[in-house]
């Protein structure tokens, strides 16, 4: 719609002008700034605006074109709004769909496979999934990826924890080290390991400091990944396209190190190998190889980003926990030293989540020890409610909410309020024994201001999607759907629909609103309720 409106100005201005929405709805649907174009044409701004209004006044797409304080304001015609309303109703879930845009590799969650997902992981998971859904819908080729940290000490520690828990189940002596994974899930895993490997496998006493049973480690890691995949499914996160193993990538370390050395990125000091990351905005240089010759965690990330950039996407997006903020500069420095463009990498941060229940801190999971598990909260409030609340704010801001509020069945609960708008409209159509698309042949005409405002707001949907994706802010879509639901409830409470003289026109407007709400919620990974 915006492109078509802007296109009407192109012949007169020489380019597609920027369109904005007037703050006051009485000033129309769109506004075009005039001063720049008057100056380019060496004309008085008022005279230039008046001439432009005269030239565009006969366009069938515009009901009114007028000059106001340096802007040309446009009010769209009923027939133009009807044209786009028909697109909504006929294209259904394909409305606002695009194609042929950038190829993007989006990596998110990438939680260590040492336990089930906790609530902090869930926010990043929902954030990433919403970005992927919206991006794909509007035409970006978004490939999603989960980086499996299966090469570090944490995997050895997982295997050790399972081994010792198995010995404890078998009634054997156990000396627990200071650091290990605890919780019911480790005990469950240990019981399963006894069945898998047999009791004799766990009878040997081991030195916890030097334990490294790769067979048990990998078995436990795979079990944890399956658990994580169950949590991802429970959150209604779209299955990942790629699962990339850190352990497999380490086979390329010598090759990657050779590239870094050739490009002058490394030096030795104090028996360690350092990356010259301070040359690229990092506060200091970073160790990539320890004194004992083992690569650091950073080395693994360098290999991974080398592998990513070799795949030649147009853009790379990583979603990290906010505690990784200090890590950004060193990774971008490594990318630069590898000969790639670090500006192609965007790193988005997902902040902490604080959960309450009845005003009190949400209870930690007995199953995981000191974490709140995704699976527990999903059982408590459902995936849709949890996804919605995660998408009400920018991901890089702190989020605190009470799960009891998510179960409230009134207008104070935004998720309920939006769904109620959809269900309310669907109920009207069920009573009329009509489908939404049955209204496509009804002509929108003689629209009142309330009617015009509501249908115009619904038709802002494609623009909202673009802004939500380009800015990596899916909460813009959430806020828009809440605004649309509010406008609908206000309209419906003030205007009679069934039995009114304008029943058909109003049914069509409601059909458009319901269609947009359903599609919008689906792009947030939420199912619109048909009945409430």
Curated annotation (Swiss-Prot):
Reaction(s) this enzyme catalyzes, per UniProt: tRNA(Arg) + L-arginine + ATP = L-arginyl-tRNA(Arg) + AMP + diphosphate
EC class (word): ligase
E.C. no: 6.1.1.19
Gene3D superfamilies: Arginyl tRNA synthetase N-terminal domain, HUPs, Isoleucyl-tRNA Synthetase, Domain 1
Predominant location category: cytoplasm
UniProt keyword terms in alphabetical order: Aminoacyl-tRNA synthetase, ATP-binding, Cytoplasm, Ligase, Nucleotide-binding, Protein biosynthesis
GO biological processes: arginyl-tRNA aminoacylation
Subunit structure: Monomer.
Family designation: Belongs to the class-I aminoacyl-tRNA synthetase family.
Name of the protein in question: Arginine--tRNA ligase
Organism of derivation: Nautilia profundicola (strain ATCC BAA-1463 / DSM 18972 / AmH)
Lineage: Bacteria, Pseudomonadati, Campylobacterota, Epsilonproteobacteria, Nautiliales
């Amino acid at each position: 719609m915006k492109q078509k409106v802007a296109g009407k100005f192109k012949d007169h201005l020489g380019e597609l002008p920027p369109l904005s929405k007037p703050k006051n709805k009485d000033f129309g649907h769109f506004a075009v700034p005039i001063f720049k174009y008057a100056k380019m044409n060496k004309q008085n701004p008022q005279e230039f605006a008046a001439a432009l209004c005269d030239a565009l006044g006969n366009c069938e797409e515009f009901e009114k074109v007028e000059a106001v304080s340096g802007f040309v304001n446009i009010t769209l015609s009923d027939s133009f709004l009807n044209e786009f309303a028909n697109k909504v109703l006929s294209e259904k879930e394909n409305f606002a769909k695009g194609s042929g845009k950038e190829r993007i590799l989006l990596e998110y969650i990438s939680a260590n496979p040492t336990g089930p997902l906790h609530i902090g992981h869930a926010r990043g998971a929902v954030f990433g999934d919403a970005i992927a859904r919206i991006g794909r819908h509007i035409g970006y080729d978004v490939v999603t990826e989960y980086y499996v940290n299966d090469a570090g000490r944490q995997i050895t520690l997982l295997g050790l924890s399972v081994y010792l828990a198995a010995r404890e189940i078998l009634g054997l002596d156990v000396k627990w080290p200071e650091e290990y994974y605890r919780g019911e899930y480790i005990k469950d895993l240990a019981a399963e390991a006894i069945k898998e490997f047999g009791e004799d496998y766990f009878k040997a006493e081991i030195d916890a400091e030097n334990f490294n049973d790769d067979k048990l480690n990998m078995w436990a890691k795979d079990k944890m990944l399956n658990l994580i995949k169950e949590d991802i499914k429970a959150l209604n996160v779209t299955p990942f396209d790629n699962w990339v193993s850190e352990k497999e990538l380490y086979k390329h370390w010598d090759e990657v190190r050779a590239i870094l050395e050739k490009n002058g990125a490394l030096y030795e000091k104090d028996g360690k190998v350092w990356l010259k990351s301070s040359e690229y905005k990092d506060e200091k240089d970073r160790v990539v190889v320890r004194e004992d010759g083992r690569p650091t965690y950073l080395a693994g990330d360098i290999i991974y980003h080398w592998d990513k950039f070799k795949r030649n996407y147009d853009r790379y997006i990583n979603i990290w926990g906010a505690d990784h903020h200090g890590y950004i500069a060193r990774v971008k420095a490594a990318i630069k030293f590898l000969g790639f463009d670090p500006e192609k990498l965007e790193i988005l941060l997902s902040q902490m989540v604080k959960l309450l229940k009845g005003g009190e801190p949400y209870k930690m999971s007995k199953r995981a020890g000191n974490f709140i598990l995704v699976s527990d909260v999903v059982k408590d409030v459902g995936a849709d409610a949890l996804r919605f609340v995660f998408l009400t704010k920018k991901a890089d801001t702190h989020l605190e909410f009470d799960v009891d509020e998510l179960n409230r069945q009134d207008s104070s609960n935004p998720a309920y309020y939006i769904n109620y708008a959809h269900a309310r409209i669907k109920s009207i159509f069920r009573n009329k024994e009509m489908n939404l698309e049955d209204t496509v042949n009804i002509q929108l005409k003689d629209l009142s201001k309330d009617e015009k405002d509501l249908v115009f707001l619904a038709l802002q949907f494609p623009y909202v999607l673009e802004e939500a994706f380009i800015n990596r802010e899916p909460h813009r879509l959430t806020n828009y759907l809440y605004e649309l639901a509010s406008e609908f409830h206000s309209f419906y409470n003030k205007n009679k629909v069934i039995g009114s003289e304008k029943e058909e026109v109003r049914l069509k407007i409601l059909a458009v609103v319901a269609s947009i709400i359903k599609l919008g919620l689906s792009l947030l990974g939420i199912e619109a309720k048909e009945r409430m």
